[in-house]
């Protein structure tokens, strides 16, 4: 079974572009426009990855990631943002997460997502 990804990105063209790219390589992707839209989707074990923009209206990606981790401690998080430095210096603790700065190539995104799932598989093998 392919891992499922929840994508939260407020830019419509970017959201559709990322969703299509990840679906093309075989991932199941549900896409929403903001953090508050993502919340009803979050349930334990439903998604293996939250892929979220940091700067979004209503609820930003960091807050969304914190809520997602409370609902499902196993979920992995990757932030996509044009504000990587700002986000990391904001002093708010984000769950252990990967960061991908815009602009990026689709192959970089796919490679990072693949790597997250490879790491997760390795972790699972070593868990008692």
Q: Across the structure, where does each feature detected by a protein language model lie?
A:
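Two-component/phosphorelay signaling modules centered on CheY-like receiver
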Residues: 11-30, 97
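C-terminal output helix
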Residues: 104-115, 121
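Active-site residues of response regulator receiver
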Residues: 53
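Conserved sequence signature across two-component system core domains
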Residues: 8-9, 32, 50
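Receiver (REC) domain active-site loop signature in two-component systems and cognate sites
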Residues: 56
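Short amphipathic alpha-helix used as the core "switch/output" element in two-component signaling
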Residues: 40, 62-74
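Helix N-cap/capping motif at the beta->alpha junctions
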Residues: 31-40, 61
């Amino acid at each position: 079974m392919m891992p499922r990804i929840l994508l939260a990105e407020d830019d419509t063209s970017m959201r559709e572009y990322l969703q299509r790219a990840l679906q093309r390589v075989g991932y199941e992707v549900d896409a929403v426009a903001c953090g508050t839209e993502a919340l009803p989707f979050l349930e334990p074990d439903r998604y293996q990855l939250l892929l979220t923009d940091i700067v979004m209206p209503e609820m930003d990606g960091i807050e969304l990631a914190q809520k997602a981790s409370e609902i499902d401690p196993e979920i992995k998080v990757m932030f996509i943002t044009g504000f990587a430095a700002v986000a990391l210096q904001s002093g708010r603790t984000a769950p252990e997460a990967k960061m991908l700065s815009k602009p990026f190539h689709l192959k970089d995104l796919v490679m990072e997502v693949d790597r997250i799932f490879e790491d997760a598989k390795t972790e699972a093998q070593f868990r008692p």
